[in-house]
Amino acid sequence: MAENSMYHTHISAKHRWLDLNLKEVWQYRDLIYLFTKRNFVVSYKQTILGPAWIFLTPLFTSIVQAFVFGGIAGIGTDGIPTFLFYLCSNAVWAYFANCLTSNANTFTANAYMFGKVYFPRLTTPISNVISTVIRFGIQMVLVLLFMVYYLFQGTLHPHWLWWLMIPVELVHLGILGMGFGIIISSMTTKYRDLTVLVDFGVSLWMYATPVVYPLSMLGEGWMRTVLQINPVT
């Protein structure tokens, strides 16, 4: 008769600042998949339009911004069609903002699970980022459709080499948003006011980032220098 397999869990103190133990996280990849699936189910549960909101949210936001900032305020977009400029900007900003806000309370929101069973705490932030990447990918389909439309209209002349940087920027913004979110989440366990402050702060941060206006609009003064320090710029 075959002997029963024995599993041993060794728990030890961490001695390094950066001790991610990615090998252990990879062993729990099935759990990351389940958390990612849960995020989608919870987000669109009991909604009439369901996942259609992934398209509708940036679409309506871009229409309003194109009307207000492009039409009324007359802010230029450096030769890019106004609606497409705001659609692309909103998609990228929403990706970063969701990576941050979804992880800003990840430890408090999942505290009931942390106290019952052991699993790498990094699995929940990673699943949040993966969910956001999937939403961004779906929104990029909408962006590409409008790009094709403007290309046929002859009003868009893109620099295709810049598209090669999209995967790099996705990783950069994802890690940045997740990192800020985890730091804030570790602090919200004691200071719950940060939960409200994060939503408010992200809204203000958008206006300190070239989302509703091009960076070239600021010229070469000190304001341009300040905005270039902004990691999301």
Where are these regions (language model features)?
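Hydrophobic transmembrane alpha-helices and immediately adjacent juxtamembrane helices
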Residues: M1-T233
